[in-house]
Amino acid sequence: MAEKKKIGILGASGYTGAELVRLLLRHPRVEIVLLTADRRAGHKMGDVFPQFAPYDLPQLVSIDSVDWAAAKLDLVFCALPHATTQTVLKDLLSKAPETKVVDLSADFRLQDPAVYAKWYGHEHHALDLQQEAVYGLTEIYRRDVKKARLVANPGCYTTCAQLPLIPLLKAKAIESDEIVIDAKSGMTGAGRSAKEEMLFSEVSEGFHAYGVGHHRHMSELDQEFSKAAGKDVLVTFTPHLTPMNRGIYSTIYVRGRRGKTARDLHETLSKQYEKDPFVYVLPFGKTPNSRHVRGSNMTFIGVAEDRKPGRAIIVSTLDNLTKGASGQAVQNMNVMLGFAETLGLDQPALSS
């Protein structure tokens, strides 16, 4: 049997870190040898997430205590906040340049330093790595991911919108200036740190929009849609927070270009993803339920005809912690390390 690859997870005490552990524990070709969580250093992973108590996992340590050169890690997942990430990875890759990285923060998703500074409020301090990073929407950039040392894992909202829209923009099948994305997220998308507005009594029985007109994922959507369309695209995007744990659900309104109908758009997407294991295009006119992807690495996409001539409604859904974060990160790892893309990710959605 081939020797297992040594894997580290930075920021293991958050939801995406825990999801990475869950997925990698059943991966036959890797071994988790490093888990960091500065505020939980010295604790066991099972102390932070009791579901991991039965498993033989390394003790949580602080990042500052890690000797990157001595660790000889094959790949690191970075689930740290933006700004912190660029400093940590600059140090890591200077001391262990052969280590590959999948970054789940926003630090390396945007290719223009000025755009990053505008949306995130500070200058980027690892510009060489920013230019090196490959955007990790696996189904679209698989060839680039395969050759990359540093992959910027896309955001959850952006993955859910880009998978249906990028193929249509590339095919010039829709008007690029008439895209409206109405998206909903589960509570885990807000992270694990304690916040008053995230208390059960504050979110239960309610539903609200946030970041209206200025959510940071708009910059990511604009960048990738502009590349696909071959011209500048400014998207209308409104996110909402819903009282469920997991899930992204996007309802997208588009106009067909040059007489393209909703059925034409459905055919384009069906052909695009017919061989992709983690994207399922429903029969025309059918729409997905977020429950049907929960806990899986799947994205379900539906296309329906609007009653307005020339317009179509696209509905896509994924699990924000899996395909929207850690699952896609493992998918990228598989491509980077030469494994089968589905390895460790082929479990179906939870039934309830």
Swiss-Prot record:
GO biological process: L-arginine biosynthetic process
PANTHER family per record: N-ACETYL-GAMMA-GLUTAMYL-PHOSPHATE REDUCTASE, CHLOROPLASTIC-RELATED, N-ACETYL-GAMMA-GLUTAMYL-PHOSPHATE REDUCTASE, CHLOROPLASTIC-RELATED-RELATED
Keywords, ordered alphabetically: Amino-acid biosynthesis, Arginine biosynthesis, Cytoplasm, NADP, Oxidoreductase
Subcellular localization(s) per the UniProt record: Cytoplasm
HAMAP family: ArgC_type1
Keyword Flavoprotein: no
Function (record text): Catalyzes the NADPH-dependent reduction of N-acetyl-5-glutamyl phosphate to yield N-acetyl-L-glutamate 5-semialdehyde.
Top EC class for this record: oxidoreductase
UniProt keyword annotation of Magnesium present: no
GO MF terms held by the record: N-acetyl-gamma-glutamyl-phosphate reductase activity; NAD binding; NADP+ binding
Protein name: N-acetyl-gamma-glutamyl-phosphate reductase
Entry's Gene Ontology cellular component terms: cytoplasm
Pathway info: Amino-acid biosynthesis; L-arginine biosynthesis; N(2)-acetyl-L-ornithine from L-glutamate: step 3/4
InterPro entries tied to this protein: AGPR_AS, AGPR_type-1, NAD(P)-bd_dom_sf, NAGSA_dehydrogenase, Semialdehyde_DH_NAD-bd
Family: Belongs to the NAGSA dehydrogenase family. Type 1 subfamily.
Active site: C156
Enzyme Commission numbers on file: 1.2.1.38
Reactions accelerated catalytically: N-acetyl-L-glutamate 5-semialdehyde + phosphate + NADP(+) = N-acetyl-L-glutamyl 5-phosphate + NADPH + H(+)
CDD domains in the record: AGPR_1_C, AGPR_1_N
